[in-house]
Amino acid sequence: MTLLPTCETRVLLTSHMKRFFILISTAWLLSPIFLFAGNHPGTDRISLNNNCPPGFEQVAGKCYLRNLYQLYPSLQDAGVGGLKTGLPALREGFTPRQIDLGRYLFFDPFLSGDGSLSCGSCHHPDFGFSDGMDRSIGITGDKVKRSSPSLWNVAFLDDLFWDARAASLEEQSKGPLFSPDEMGNTEDRLVSDLNGNQTYIRLFNEAFGSQAITAPLVYTALAAFQSTLISLNSRYDQYAHGYHAALTQTEIEGFNIFRSFVARCAECHTPPLFTNREIAIIGTPEPAGLPFDEGEGGWTGEPTQRGGFKVPALRNIALTAPYMHSGRFDNLKDAVGFYTKGRGHAVPESENLSIHWHIWEPDLSDHEVDLIVSFLETLSDESLEPAIPERVPSGLNPVGRMPARNTN
């Protein structure tokens, strides 16, 4: 049974929706369409945006998210899988210039040790801010240990990385930047290189009022940009806000299975973010020839956390194949089908994992798995996707080397 909103709620939602779409339209109209590079030979001057990204409102010079979910109660009040669910707190309150500076840094290969990779190489908009690989390819040309997680809605997450080892977006930035097998840079070299670029010196001064570029300012700018990667306007969201024609009957059936006590998907992938932001041990298999990945237990040393990984958000999940921390499953049907095969069925005999209590054997039919997949495809929404800069301050090609999409 679907509960319709009261007249008072309808009026409030209508008013808020008008304001929401005005915010989006105004931000796009005021945003510069072409942003060119600065002091590098052959480029024009780059300027930072003075307006918040679409979906954000500027208050006292800082950007704050405005979304219909903010009108709803907490996740706990709405129940698991409920439609009228609220949002947890998020990182926000950055200035438009800090956000835009972060965008240039994110897509500039200048941040890597040899100028070949940017953050956007492994977190590309075309792949749902992942990279389409089972495991990402780093600066050495070799695959790294895990797949590249999507960055959509990371502003809502308390812990980052598959194994939850970073407690903030700023801390998370250091991992790929300075990992020898990812972007291969060092903090000293990064700061030195940026301070040797007159365009970056000017942009950091405009964004932070600082005459010198420091590492913490780099991390803050990257965090500011990533905090605006919001995806909450899919067809599912339209359905959740009361427009029931947004989903087909097949997709609604898939959603009902998804949140049912039998499948229990929504126990961990809780709307509206479709993650409970916790660690789960589910015992997914590693690719052939690879050792067992200890996950969270690898850095905590806690035996009960071995094989534990962050519950990924399912927003834009149709764009981010392959799936799981190692990219073990090529498609959504295989990923969903994994859960139907029995508790701990893929755990190596040498491991005694504390499998999450939600994991059991729902014994779903192929048709029911297909219905869940059809629902998951309704979570696609790139309406607030930021533009890749036409030019970046280094003069290098934006984004950098992109590996071919494959799982070999």
Regions inferred by a protein language model and the residue ranges of each:
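Positively charged n-region of N-terminal signal peptides that target proteins for export
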Residues: 15-19
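Short glycine/threonine-rich turn/loop motifs
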Residues: 39-175, 237-351, 387-408
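Bacterial N-terminal signal peptides
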Residues: 24-32
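Boundary at the C-terminal end of the N-terminal hydrophobic targeting segment
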Residues: 35-37
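C-terminal capping alpha-helices of c-type cytochrome domains
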Residues: 187-232, 318, 328-408
